[in-house]
Regions:
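A compositional/biophysical signature of low hydrophobicity enriched in polar/charged and small residues
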Residues: 1-106
Length: 106
C-alpha cells in the first residue's frame, strides 16, 4: 500500500475542536477513518509552530487518499499537505528506468 506523510495545521475552529476533544481522541478518529478506507494509521504526532500535526498513513491507493484529502479540506477545520513516501527499494526501481527528458531551452 502507498504510504503518505500528511502535515496538518488546524484552523481556529479545528483547534477549538481539538481542545474540546483531546489529542488521543483525535488520533483514534484518524485511526478509525483510515481503517474505514482500507488503510492504516502508522504514526500520529502533534507539534507546535507552523504545523500542528504530522501523520503517517498507508492508503489503498492515490485516488482514495485524494478523496480523503478533499473531504478533510472541505471541512474547513484543518489545512493539510500530503506527501507520497517512497521506500529505498522504490527509488532503486526508479533509478533503473530510462527517462527521455529535454530541459527547457535545450
Amino acid at each position: 500500500m502507498p504510504k503518505y506523510l500528511t502535515v496538518a495545521s488546524y484552523t481556529a475552529e479545528g483547534a477549538k475542536g481539538l481542545l474540546k476533544e483531546g489529542g488521543t481522541a483525535r488520533r483514534a478518529a484518524v485511526d478509525e477513518l483510515m481503517k474505514s478506507l482500507g488503510g492504516r494509521l502508522e504514526a500520529f504526532y502533534f507539534a507546535f509552530g507552523d504545523n500542528d500535526a504530522y501523520v503517517i498513513t498507508e492508503g489503498p491507493d492515490n485516488v482514495t487518499t485524494a478523496a480523503l484529502s478533499l473531504t478533510v479540506s472541505a471541512s474547513g477545520a484543518v489545512r493539510t499537505k500530503t506527501i507520497v513516501l517512497l521506500t529505498p527499494e522504490e527509488i532503486d526501481q526508479a533509478a533503473k528506468k530510462t527517462v527521455k527528458f529535454r530541459p527547457p531551452g535545450s
